[in-house]
Regions:
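Short, low-complexity N-terminal intrinsically disordered segments enriched in polar/charged residues
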Residues: 1-28, 32-33
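A beta-strand edge to alpha-helix "cap/lid" segment located at domain peripheries
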Residues: 2-5, 10, 17, 41, ...
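An acidic, carboxylate-rich microenvironment
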Residues: 29, 51-52
Length: 129
């Protein structure tokens, strides 16, 4: 069994920069928070490597939506960071109403470089019932 203590705090700059890159559809330096060999599991996604994560998110977001991520709370447990927020999804298709699902994300920090994320596990939604 592993026990971690968490501190509720303001979201760090690296996390805000990553969300901004997604919201602005720039996908640039905000992704430098990931280790080169990071793994991302969002729902059923299994994306490998910093560049794989960047490109897969670009493909997903560019399929017809604009997003805005809001931080609701952030918990720092040292090697594990937990984020809860809301994402507003505005679709390019005017027939689709915007949605604002809850998101929860776990960021496991790299053992050799604790400033980098080695694994990102998260979920968004549901977006409808």
């Amino acid at each position: 069994m592993t026990t971690l203590n968490f501190t509720k705090t303001e979201a760090p700059e690296w996390l805000l920069a990553m969300w901004k890159e997604i919201d602005d559809k720039t996908f640039g330096k905000g992704f430098d928070c990931f280790a080169d060999d990071a793994v991302c599991n969002l729902g059923v996604a299994d994306w490998r490597g910093r560049e794989g994560i960047r490109e897969s998110l670009r493909e997903f977001i560019d399929k017809g939506m604009t997003t805005h991520h809001d931080v609701v709370e952030y918990w720092d447990g040292g090697s594990l960071k937990i984020f809860r927020g809301l994402v507003t999804m505005n679709f390019d298709d005017p027939a689709k109403e915007p949605v604002r699902p809850v998101m929860t994300h776990f960021f496991y920090m790299d053992k050799t470089d604790p400033a980098k994320v080695s694994r990102w596990v998260g979920s968004v939604g549901p977006t409808e019932f």
